[in-house]
């Protein structure tokens, strides 16, 4: 089975970018909640 590298990279970015974005928001809100 041949895998298109560009398609694999695009899929990885499509999954990782929103996940990292949500994690950053989550960490920021958690740190703010701990300070308050």
Swiss-Prot record:
The chain crosses the membrane at residues 5-25. InterPro entries: PSII_PsbM, PSII_PsbM_sf. GO terms for cellular component: chloroplast thylakoid membrane; photosystem II. The keyword Thylakoid applies. It is a single-pass membrane protein. It holds the Pfam family PsbM. GO terms for biological process: photosynthesis, light reaction. It is found in: Plastid, Chloroplast thylakoid membrane. Its main location: plastid. Keywords: Chloroplast, Membrane, Photosynthesis, Photosystem II, Plastid, Reaction center, Thylakoid, Transmembrane, Transmembrane helix. The keyword Thylakoid applies. It comes from the Eukaryota. Belongs to the PsbM family. One of the components of the core complex of photosystem II (PSII). PSII is a light-driven water:plastoquinone oxidoreductase that uses light energy to abstract electrons from H(2)O, generating O(2) and a proton gradient subsequently used for ATP formation. It consists of a core antenna complex that captures photons, and an electron transfer chain that converts photonic excitation into a charge separation. This subunit is found at the monomer-monomer interface. NCBIfam families: PS_II_psbM (TIGR03038). PSII is composed of 1 copy each of membrane proteins PsbA, PsbB, PsbC, PsbD, PsbE, PsbF, PsbH, PsbI, PsbJ, PsbK, PsbL, PsbM, PsbT, PsbX, PsbY, PsbZ, Psb30/Ycf12, at least 3 peripheral proteins of the oxygen-evolving complex and a large number of cofactors. It forms dimeric complexes. This is Photosystem II reaction center protein M.
